[in-house]
């Protein structure tokens, strides 16, 4: 370990630097020293060359003084002699412990006790400026930092080279996988991860190596596109409770403004509704979109308002109401049904269009019901089929009005621009 005042100049000129080699030369040559130190000959030759042109006492000093040292400050002047005294008193203490003791002792000194060392440090500074007027301090580089940089620079090269030969034709693929990209290069399989578990936390920035490919997963968006079709795992929303509706007066739904309702359907292939110039069945029988499963099926205010239900503002909500008209009759439904329960009917807004009820008179039931198995196909991702949810196909308008209302409710939420 180097001395703490190695970077500072010293006035101790009495002990020459070559005193120890002279004593060792008087004792005779050591054969084991030559075999253990291959650089011994080089050092001896350098000392011989230096001593040939200068006296032995100043040769080592001249070589060591090739790099100009900084002048010592007051603490270094005081600690130079104090460190020797502490080292003699405590030979077992480490140099770091000695430095801690010296620091505490220096802080404990008074200004009067520090004054002679401060004056000596100022004299050394002035002398240093006279001896080296163009001196500029250049700090030495730390060897430990260099060593770490070399290790970090050769980290990927050391890992890629042994694996490139073992992978065969895909050896060049490893370098692309080691860049930490979120997706692999198209057209190639993802290579093995380059990060080994025993590397430790020193290379934490390389944890992206061998990350799983993300191009097989869609981006999480709250609103799905109408062009995506029916999802494989649709979301379900519970039907509105009767307690959420007002008990008397005008039956309107308060959170209607929270939804983006657009009565005008977009122009394009997702136009769900009857065409005035053509047959009415192809538009009605189109399967509901994925957006309808999110908003229009389970208690959406604007979607359920367009299903042909008429509000009765003068009648309060009663537990046992008279039987509704045929277009309002629906079988008992579960919480995930496309059609709402009868007790939620007074909450509907009667200002919406009653176009599905007008279409019922023009529809042939026998022709319409043959398409019911297609609408309730299980692979379309719908929650229930007709026989599961209790839909009675022989009912007057139960299943027909349910499907027509489901298809028409998708129109109110398909407010996407054309893609």
Swiss-Prot record:
Residues 319-328 have a biased composition (Pro residues). Detected in lung and testis. Detected in endothelial cells around small and large arteries in newborns and adults, but is barely detectable in veins (at protein level). GO terms for cellular component: nucleoplasm; nucleus; transcription regulator complex. Keywords: Activator, DNA-binding, Nucleus, Transcription, Transcription regulation, Wnt signaling pathway. A motif (9aaTAD) lies at residues 366-374. GO terms for molecular function: beta-catenin binding; DNA binding; DNA-binding transcription activator activity, RNA polymerase II-specific; DNA-binding transcription factor activity; DNA-binding transcription factor activity, RNA polymerase II-specific; RNA polymerase II-specific DNA-binding transcription factor binding; sequence-specific DNA binding; transcription cis-regulatory region binding. Coiled coil: none annotated. Signal peptide: none annotated. Gene3D superfamilies: High mobility group box domain (1.10.30.10). Pfam families: HMG_box, Sox17_18_mid. Residues 1-27, 303-356 are annotated as: Disordered. It is found in: Nucleus. One of its GO terms (biological process) is cell migration involved in gastrulation. Disruption phenotype: Embryonic lethal due to defects in the development of the definite gut endoderm, aberrant heart looping and severe defects in vascular development and remodeling, including a lack of artery formation. Embryos die at about 10.5 dpc. Besides, mutant embryos display a severe defect in fetal hematopoiesis. Residues 68-136 bind DNA. Residues 278-418 form the Sox C-terminal domain. CDD domains: HMG-box_SoxF_SOX17 (cd22047). PANTHER family: SOX TRANSCRIPTION FACTOR, TRANSCRIPTION FACTOR SOX-17. Interacts with CTNNB1, LEF1 and TCF4. The 9aaTAD motif is a transactivation domain present in a large number of yeast and animal transcription factors. Acts as a transcription regulator that binds target promoter DNA and bends the DNA. Binds to the sequences 5'-AACAAT-'3 or 5'-AACAAAG-3'. Modulates transcriptional regulation via WNT3A. Inhibits Wnt signaling. Promotes degradation of activated CTNNB1. Plays a key role in the regulation of embryonic development. Required for normal development of the definitive gut endoderm. Required for normal looping of the embryonic heart tube. Plays an important role in embryonic and postnatal vascular development, including development of arteries. This is Transcription factor SOX-17. It comes from Mus musculus. The lineage of its organism: Eukaryota, Metazoa, Chordata, Craniata, Vertebrata.
